């Protein structure tokens, strides 16, 4: 009896490439307007002050400043950008 695996097994063995999602600028990092902060599917992170959201839920900076992440009482994580003027005042 010949010992050969079924010919159909060659139909397996493919996978799609990763989508490169996740945080692109972490807390404390400097950003300029238009910088992508987070790429995501759905709203794992929500836009806070000075952060916009694209149609694919990408979060991006609206002003120049520092990125901050904060979790609020509703268990949502908000991403904000503290403007440079506010940083200088602190």
From Swiss-Prot:
PROSITE patterns: RIBOSOMAL_L27. InterPro entries: Ribosomal_bL27, Ribosomal_bL27_CS. It holds the Pfam family Ribosomal_L27. The keyword Ribonucleoprotein applies. Residues 1-27 are annotated as: Disordered. One of its GO terms (molecular function) is structural constituent of ribosome. Keywords: Ribonucleoprotein, Ribosomal protein. GO terms for biological process: translation. One of its GO terms (cellular component) is cytosolic large ribosomal subunit. HAMAP family: Ribosomal_bL27. Belongs to the bacterial ribosomal protein bL27 family. This is Large ribosomal subunit protein bL27. It comes from Xanthobacter autotrophicus (strain ATCC BAA-1158 / Py2).
């Amino acid at each position: 009896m010949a010992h050969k695996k079924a010919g159909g097994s060659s139909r397996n063995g493919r996978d799609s490439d990763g989508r490169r999602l996740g945080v692109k600028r972490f807390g404390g990092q400097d950003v300029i307007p238009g910088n992508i902060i987070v790429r995501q599917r759905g709203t794992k992170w929500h836009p806070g002050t000075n952060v916009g959201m694209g149609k694919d839920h990408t979060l991006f900076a609206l002003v120049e400043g520092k990125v901050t992440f904060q979790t609020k009482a509703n268990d949502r994580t908000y991403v904000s950008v503290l403007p440079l003027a506010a940083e200088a005042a602190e």
